[in-house]
């Protein structure tokens, strides 16, 4: 295993180590707007959960990481913590170590247990633990060194939790804003993911105009995602570095735009997960990226 420099100062440079989970106990439950839409419309759409299909899709995602040279680490699976494999939310990596989050969903409130276990057993420093209101890792977007956005929708991360996290990052001298988002998108990484130093994938129709202005003033251009693809978690991709993107099947418009911009795009079928509340970005936590 390659030696790691734990921590990230961006979310787009070459990914070296990633934290995942094992969806051995996965099932669809009402876990917010995304899964609720799936369950409420299933009698018309005909979609059904299948664990074997989910496991096969997850295995294909892992194969892509490994073939890209990424070392994969895993949270311990647990039959009670049956959604802890969505590794984005129970913690998040920063330049200063791991941030342990305070999750709102009842079925995920104890996910911090396996997150803390992982960091302690691998001698990865824990920087902070959220205490002021709920905060989930998908709402921290590290844009580039010195710049970050912290989101909240209220149903998952709350304003108090997001403001606590933002204050800690500001103490490090970073330029940070707290961003309210529509609950439909659950977390900010469902609306905005940086893929280069000054380029982000986003759904401009769903971001507040002042957020777009804030980003533009800091040099950002955008690859815009349609509202239809964004509500299906199209934005929720993972930059692997070196003009490589882990996206998903179904994000046809976005994937075409990425290829037009010169990116190599991997687009596995992750439908058991997107219908169940999370895309490939939700399923991972970057532990070590090259410095920007």
Residue ranges and their predicted role:
Residues 1-292:
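The feature marks the mature, well-folded catalytic cores of soluble enzymes
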């Amino acid at each position: 295993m390659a030696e790691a420099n734990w921590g990230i100062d961006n979310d787009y440079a070459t990914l070296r180590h990633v934290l995942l989970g094992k969806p051995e106990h996965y099932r669809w439950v009402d876990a917010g707007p995304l899964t609720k839409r799936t369950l409420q419309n299933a009698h018309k759409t005909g979609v059904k959960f299948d664990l074997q299909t989910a496991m096969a899709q997850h295995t294909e995602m892992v194969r892509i990481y490994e073939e890209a040279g990424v070392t994969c680490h895993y949270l311990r699976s647990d039959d009670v913590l049956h959604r802890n494999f969505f590794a984005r939310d129970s913690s998040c990596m920063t330049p200063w170590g791991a941030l342990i989050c305070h999750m709102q969903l009842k079925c995920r409130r104890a996910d911090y247990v396996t997150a803390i276990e992982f960091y302690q057993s691998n001698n990865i420093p824990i920087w902070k633990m959220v205490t002021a209101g709920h905060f989930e890792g998908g709402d921290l977007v590290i844009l580039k060194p010195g710049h970050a956005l912290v989101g909240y929708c209220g149903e998952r991360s709350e304003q108090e939790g997001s403001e606590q996290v933002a204050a800690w990052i500001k103490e490090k001298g970073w330029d940070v804003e707290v961003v309210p988002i529509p609950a439909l998108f659950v977390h900010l990484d469902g609306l905005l993911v940086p893929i280069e130093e000054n380029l982000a994938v986003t759904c401009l129709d769903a971001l507040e105009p002042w957020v777009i202005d804030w980003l533009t003033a800091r040099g950002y251009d955008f690859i815009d995602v349609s509202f239809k693809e964004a509500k299906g978690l199209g934005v929720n991709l993972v930059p692997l570095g070196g003009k490589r993107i882990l996206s998903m099947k179904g994000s046809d418009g976005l994937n075409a735009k990425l290829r037009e911009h010169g990116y190599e795009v991997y687009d596995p079928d992750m439908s058991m997960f997107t219908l169940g509340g999370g895309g490939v970005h939700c399923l991972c936590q970057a532990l070590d990226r090259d410095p920007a």
